[in-house]
Amino acid sequence: MGVPERPTLLLLLSLLLIPLGLPVLCAPPRLICDSRVLERYILEAKEAENVTMGCAEGPRLSENITVPDTKVNFYAWKRMKVEEQAVEVWQGLSLLSEAILQAQALQANSSQPPESLQLHIDKAISGLRSLTSLLRVLGAQKELMSPPDATQAAPLRTLTADTFCKLFRVYSNFLRGKLKLYTGEACRRGDR
C-alpha cells in the first residue's frame, strides 16, 4: 500500500502548491483601467452635483474652499509627458480630497445638516480614497515624489468653491476630465 500512497501524496502536495503561483500568473487587470470602475465614481459625483444643484439657494459653505481648476487645454495636455500628467492629476486629487474633508467639517458645524448632503459628502470621501488607491497602481504617486523636471513643474491652477454645488461640480468635472484623460493614456501605454 506504500507505493500507491506516494503518488497520491505528491498529487495532493502539487495541488496545494499550484495556487501559490496563480496570483502571479492570473493577476486581475488594473481596476482603474476598466472604464466601468471610473464611470461608477463619475456617476456618484454627478449625482451629488445634481442633488445640490436642485436647491435654488443651494447649501452654501461658510467659507470658501480651494479646489483644483478642471479646465483642460487638450493641445497642451496631449503634449505633456504621462509623468507630468500624473503629477497634475495627483496634486488635483489631493487638493480635492482636502476640499471635501474641509466641506465635511464645515457641514458638521452647521446647525441642521441635510442628510442627503452628508450622504454625498461621505460617498465623495470614500470615492476619493478608492481612486487614490487605484492611482497608486499606475504609479501616479511616484511621479509626484520625483517629477520629470522639477524646474518646469507648473503650480497647480486653483479656484474657490463657495457652495456645495460648485464643489461637487468641480469634483465631477475633475473625474470626467483630467483623471479620465490621464488614466486612459497611462493604461494605453501600460505605465505603472
Swiss-Prot record:
It is found in: Secreted. The keyword Transmembrane helix does not apply. Gene3D superfamilies: 1.20.1250.10. One of its GO terms (cellular component) is cell body. Glycans are attached at residues 50, 64, 109. GO terms for biological process: acute-phase response; apoptotic process; cell surface receptor signaling pathway via STAT; cellular hyperosmotic response; embryo implantation; erythrocyte differentiation; erythrocyte maturation; erythropoietin-mediated signaling pathway. Produced by kidney or liver of adult mammals and by liver of fetal or neonatal mammals. GO terms for molecular function: cytokine activity; erythropoietin receptor binding; hormone activity; protein kinase activator activity. Disulfide bonds join 33-187. SUPFAM superfamilies: 4-helical cytokines (SSF47266). Keywords: Disulfide bond, Erythrocyte maturation, Glycoprotein, Hormone, Secreted, Signal. Residues 1-26 form the signal peptide. InterPro entries: 4_helix_cytokine-like_core, EPO/TPO_CS, EPO_TPO, Erythroptn. Hormone involved in the regulation of erythrocyte proliferation and differentiation and the maintenance of a physiological level of circulating erythrocyte mass. Binds to EPOR leading to EPOR dimerization and JAK2 activation thereby activating specific downstream effectors, including STAT1 and STAT3. Belongs to the EPO/TPO family. This is Erythropoietin. The gene is Epo.
